Curated annotation (Swiss-Prot):
Acetylation as UniProt keyword: no
Species in which this protein is naturally found: Methylococcus capsulatus (strain ATCC 33009 / NCIMB 11132 / Bath)
Classification via NCBIfam families: ATP_synt_6_or_A (TIGR01131), PRK05815.1-1 (NF004477)
One Pfam family here: ATP-synt_A
Protein name, per record: ATP synthase subunit a 1
Biological-process GO terms, alphabetical: proton motive force-driven plasma membrane ATP synthesis
Keywords, ordered alphabetically: ATP synthesis, Cell inner membrane, Cell membrane, CF(0), Hydrogen ion transport, Ion transport, Membrane, Transmembrane, Transmembrane helix, Transport
Species lineage: Bacteria, Pseudomonadati, Pseudomonadota, Gammaproteobacteria, Methylococcales
């Protein structure tokens, strides 16, 4: 399949085709339909299986699936207890949702490069990008949502007045340094969603690109490279989901604290 695409448009055409989203609309209102579909679908998969595990929870001996879900829940709960120092019942469910959702989106990278795009082509879709976290719109959508939660809880917990004073008089308390504090804190706040979104996007985009490059090689070379990279990539997709979750917890913990 990679050879056919290579012959049709060259290596560059093959790479561009796999990294081009299925879009609808123009300009600012362009929607990446494939990103929206796979994001919502994977979110629904997470909700379905975790709800099923919760409904099947019993006081007796749990099954393998329930053990697996409980292990993930306990792992996330431990991270929240270690990193979040406020009191908020939303943080643990939010952290669990972020970890599982981001992991599932990242895990789409482990599917054969041409599998779903060829299925899409068979039903008339010119483009189909199947890894939502390789779309900057998706990663920034999540990181900006976290940013809004940071602002919301900063205002709710500290109050507008205290939040403004903290913004203007931290880290330097002298009134003459208010402009410097304002600039410093603005950059610090804006850097959180930017770094959160770019980190996830950059790592997953690079991983997907390597899989695509491997698919361009002769078929007899591909297994020797794709299998080791896939095994290593399992660590990457898990680590990126973990980092996104932990940083979200830390940022929200800071929003609950006063300087």
């Amino acid at each position: 399949m990679a050879t056919e695409a290579h012959d049709a448009g060259g290596a560059t055409g093959y790479i561009v085709h796999h990294l081009t989203p299925l879009s609808s609309g123009e300009g600012f209102w362009t929607l990446h339909v494939d990103t929206l579909f796979f994001s919502v679908f994977l979110g629904a998969v997470f909700l379905f299986f975790f709800r099923k595990a919760a409904e099947q929870a019993t006081a007796g001996v749990p099954g393998p699936f329930q053990n697996f879900v409980e292990m993930i829940v306990e792992f996330v709960d431990t991270q929240v207890k270690d990193s979040f120092h406020g009191r908020n019942a939303l943080i643990a469910p939010l952290a669990l949702s972020i970890f599982a959702w981001v992991f599932l989106m990242n895990a789409m990278d482990l599917l054969p490069v041409d599998l779903l795009p060829d299925v899409g082509k068979a039903i008339g879709l010119e483009y189909l990008r199947v890894v939502p976290s390789t779309d900057l719109n998706a990663t920034f959508g999540m990181s900006i949502s976290v940013f809004f939660l940071i602002i919301f809880y900063s205002l709710k917990v500290k109050g507008p007045g205290h939040f403004a004073m903290e913004f203007l008089f931290h880290p330097f308390s002298h009134w003459a340094l208010v402009p410097f504090n304002l600039l410093l804190n603005t950059v610090e706040y804006l850097a959180k969603p930017v770094s959160l979104g770019l980190r996830l996007f950059g790592n997953m985009y690079a991983g997907e690109l390597i899989f695509i490059l491997i698919a361009l090689l002769p078929w007899w070379v591909q297994p020797a490279l794709s299998f080791p990279w896939a095994v290593f990539h399992i660590l990457i997709i898990t680590l990126q989901a973990f980092i996104f979750m932990v940083l979200t917890i830390v940022y929200l913990s800071l929003a609950h604290e006063s300087h």
